[in-house]
Amino acid sequence: MAKVLVLYYSAYGHIETMAQAVAEGARAAGATVDIKRVPELVPAEVAKASHYKLDQAAPVASIDDLANYDAIIVGTGTRFGRMASQMANFLDQAGGLWAKGALHGKVGGAFTSTATQHGGQETTLFSIITNLLHFGMVVVGLNYGFAGQMTLDEVTGGSPYGATTITGGDGSRQPSANELAGARYQGQVIAETAIKLHG
């Protein structure tokens, strides 16, 4: 049975919610799934004053965890069109795994959130995907089998490069039903690919 890691960073809970949906999709495909988050780098008093969501249940990952999975699906909110520094800092520690080829052939994917439709969703996804390709991973996006990314009936996230959500400038918008469906679909397709490649 394929083992899938949903690895995320979420300051305000939007990506945490998306991570849970990604995991649901991967489980529906028959994979064993763990959800873990990367360490917070912001000092506790600053995070509290900034109203970060500090009660997230997912355990904190270690870099060596990555080698234990057949698929790794990475999610983080955007920071100026790229992944958050917390996720970048974590992935930057994977040099030892990269040098050993420990991640070659694993399946990977990315998901993100932005405040606005044009807040850098695709560039953020590319910033994650670039890392996965350097690690030697097989990248799977959100293919057009998920018709929800084609809708014009609502403001919605989603791209062939990965599932996304739009939070609104003040963060009050939560992931929509369509965005969560896209996250589940991507999780399922990545898990199905991992099962085909790794059993």
Curated annotation (Swiss-Prot):
Q: Where does FMN bind?
A: 10-15, 78-80, 113-119, 134
What the record says about family reads: Belongs to the WrbA family.
Task: Recite the UniProt keywords alphabetically.
Answer: Flavoprotein, FMN, NAD, NADP, Nucleotide-binding, Oxidoreductase
A Pfam family of the record is FMN_red
- Which species is the source of this protein? Rhodopseudomonas palustris (strain BisA53)
Q: Broadest EC class?
A: oxidoreductase
- Mention one GO molecular function: NADH:ubiquinone reductase (non-electrogenic) activity
Q: Which residues does NAD(+) bind?
A: Y12
Instruction: Tell me the domain of life.
Output: Bacteria
Q: Record keywords: Transport included?
A: no
Q: How is the cofactor bound?
A: Binds 1 FMN per monomer.
Q: What is the E.C. number?
A: 1.6.5.2
Q: Name one GO cellular component term.
A: membrane
Kindly list the cofactors needed. FMN
Please report the stretch or stretches of sequence annotated as the Flavodoxin-like domain. Answer: 4-190
The family database entries (InterPro entries) matched by this protein are listed as: Flavodoxin/NO_synth, Flavoprotein-like_sf, Flavoprotein_WrbA-like, FMN_Rdtase-like_dom, NQO
Q: Which reaction does it catalyse?
A: a quinone + NADH + H(+) = a quinol + NAD(+); a quinone + NADPH + H(+) = a quinol + NADP(+)
Keyword set includes Flavoprotein: yes
Can you tell me which residues bind substrate? W98
**What is this protein's record name?**
NAD(P)H dehydrogenase (quinone)
